Amino acid sequence: MANRGPVPSPLTPRQLECLSRIASGETSAEIGEALGLSKRTVDHYVLNACARLGVRNRTQAVAKAIGDGMILAPPP
């Protein structure tokens, strides 16, 4: 079978942005403020990302997104 390049992310750009910011240590409220969204909207993006990734919580979602190369790990 021919290599067709990288597999597209199952997540939306906004979900990826939220997970990236969570990985950097931001809370849902901080992410919402920075992006002009409510905390509840951010939580909704994260919940949907968890469902798409097949994980149970935001920590697992961040770990899977980093492990699968969807987002970059934050600097130490």
Where are these regions (language model features)?
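Helix-turn-helix DNA-binding segment
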Residues: 2-41
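Residues within the DNA-recognition helix of helix-turn-helix
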Residues: 14, 45-48
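Residue-level detector of secondary-structure transition/capping positions
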Residues: 26, 39, 50, 69-70
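Basic, Lys/Arg-enriched C-terminal extension of HTH/homeodomain DNA-binding domains
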Residues: 52-76
